[in-house]
Amino acid sequence: MADQAPFDTDVNTLTRFVMEEGRKARGTGELTQLLNSLCTAVKAISSAVRKAGIAHLYGIAGSTNVTGDQVKKLDVLSNDLVMNMLKSSFATCVLVSEEDKHAIIVEPEKRGKYVVCFDPLDGSSNIDCLVSVGTIFGIYRKKSTDEPSEKDALQPGRNLVAAGYALYGSATMLVLAMDCGVNCFMLDPAIGEFILVDKDVKIKKKGKIYSLNEGYARDFDPAVTEYIQRKKFPPDNSAPYGARYVGSMVADVHRTLVYGGIFLYPANKKSPNGKLRLLYECNPMAYVMEKAGGMATTGKEAVLDVIPTDIHQRAPVILGSPDDVLEFLKVYEKHSAQ
């Protein structure tokens, strides 16, 4: 043990990992620039989330601090951080955020070839009770040669170049999915870098946990009601599934990825088109799941096949372990045929 160094002198950071992947693909390095800038925003948000109580960032947009500056709510602050960092990466041309009604077109002198759709602080409505929150992102290549516009963001999830999320939990983790698979990076606060901790992550074929908001049970489709009953009272007398629901999509999906099982936010009578947003919630998570060997469906088609018509379009989503999602689809198709 005496000859063991206290530090790993050859750590694989996210920057190094993306540079290596870019080199294999003979890329221009633009995606590396983009992800580096995104990482900086994530580190800043992570710091802000941890300091929120002390810095009075909880739900007080409009108040002023001791120097007379406007104090921003965490989600507004997070949005500004991601926007500014992505613009300054010189790799983006169109930015779509949950916080902005219209797409943001990057100034000509800062433009690059990528379109980024993101939710800067998913689950922020839960932050007052210290529930884990996160940042979700999806990166597309601009397809047209025209001037950048909102239309450039209206691409199906199949066109994603990279997607993922940052989870601000007991530690800060960044999960990145690209063609090479899904990789997890943990923020080491000692050196301020994301370190590769889980390589080529694969989800279990079948899990033991289901996750959805059962408070909406009254409005569920019969197919969803039947599927949940099967999880609670399995027809073959096997052990029932455990129920876990945080209400923060990043936390619920990350647990599903790590432990296996199924996450559902289906359409219901109140929200016939689903509630989660396709471009910056459903698509990135569906991409992560598929790259990890899982599945993601709306019930009618794969989430990644949905062609968006609006940047804030909603979609139902059922994702997770392939066997669990297939079982849901079997029940869903049975009810659709009736």
From Swiss-Prot:
Coiled coil: none annotated. Binds 3 Mg(2+) ions per subunit. The modification N6-succinyllysine is found at K151. AMP binds at V18, M19, E20, E21, G22, T28, G29, E30, L31, T32, K113, Y114, R141. Substrate binds at residues 122-125, 213-216, 244-249, 265, 275-277. Its cofactor is Mg(2+). It is an enzyme of class 3 (hydrolase). Subject to complex allosteric regulation. The enzyme can assume an active R-state, or an inactive T-state. Intermediate conformations may exist. AMP acts as an allosteric inhibitor. AMP binding affects the turnover of bound substrate and not the affinity for substrate. Fructose 2,6-bisphosphate acts as a competitive inhibitor. Fructose 2,6-bisphosphate and AMP have synergistic effects. The modification N-acetylalanine is found at A2. InterPro entries: FBPase_C_dom, FBPase_class-1, FBPase_N, FBPtase, Fructose_bisphosphatase_AS. Belongs to the FBPase class 1 family. This is Fructose-1,6-bisphosphatase 1.
